[in-house]
Amino acid sequence: MPSTPEEKKKVLTRVRRIRGQIDALERSLEGDAECRAILQQIAAVRGAANGLMAEVLESHIRETFDRNDCYSREVSQSVDDTIELVRAYLK
């Protein structure tokens, strides 16, 4: 879980954006929108959820392995590399 107020604010902003996308998707489904438009909205929700997951996971990894400079520069670089890989996978 994000530990700083700034990180928490970013995560909550993402959650609210996803909520807005879900609400728009629901309205589209209720309004019998075209399948193409609905699929596009679903893809946007999925992308936003993956972004949220990456943000929270990055925060967790950094809190667990990269706090207070107690590890070597090599470990810090490994943490950065791992986060980069996770973000690429979730795109």
Curated annotation (Swiss-Prot):
Molecular function, one GO term: transcription cis-regulatory region binding
Residues with site note (Important for response to formaldehyde): P2, C35
Substitution effect: P2A: Fails to respond to formaldehyde. The mutant exhibits enhanced sensitivity to formaldehyde
One GO term describing the cellular component: cytoplasm
GO term, biological process aspect, one: negative regulation of DNA-templated transcription
Any Pfam family matching the protein: Trns_repr_metal
Nuclease is among the record's keywords: no
InterPro entries: Metal_Tscrpt_repr, Metal_Tscrpt_repr_sf
Induction: Negatively autoregulated. Induced by formaldehyde. Also induced by acetaldehyde, methylglyoxal and glyoxal, albeit to lesser extents. Markedly induced (41-fold) by polyhexamethylene biguanide (PHMB), a broad-spectrum antibacterial agent, but overexpression of the gene causes no change in PHMB sensitivity. Not induced by S-nitrosoglutathione or bulky aldehydes, such as furaldehyde and tribromoacetaldehyde.
Compartment(s) of residence: Cytoplasm
UniProt keyword list: Cytoplasm, DNA-binding, Repressor, Transcription, Transcription regulation
Activity: how regulated: The presence of formaldehyde leads to the formation of methylene bridges between Pro-2 and Cys-35 residues of adjacent subunits, which remodels the surface of the tetramer. These conformational changes lead to de-repression of frmRAB expression by promoting disassociation of FrmR from the frmRAB promoter region. Can bind Zn(II), however Zn(II) blocks amino acid residues required for formaldehyde sensing. It is likely that Zn(II) could only inhibit FrmR activity in vivo under conditions when Zn(II) homeostasis is severely perturbed.
Result for mutant: C70A: Does not impair response to formaldehyde
Domain of life: Bacteria
Protein family according to the UniProt entry: Belongs to the FrmR/RcnR family.
SUBUNIT field: Homotetramer. Dimer of dimers.
Stated role: Formaldehyde sensor. In the absence of formaldehyde, mediates repression of the frmRAB operon. Acts by binding directly to the frmRAB promoter region. In the presence of formaldehyde, it dissociates from the frmRAB promoter region and allows expression of the formaldehyde detoxification system encoded by frmA and frmB. It senses the toxic chemical formaldehyde directly, with no metal-dependence.
Protein name: Transcriptional repressor FrmR
Lineage of producing organism: Bacteria, Pseudomonadati, Pseudomonadota, Gammaproteobacteria, Enterobacterales
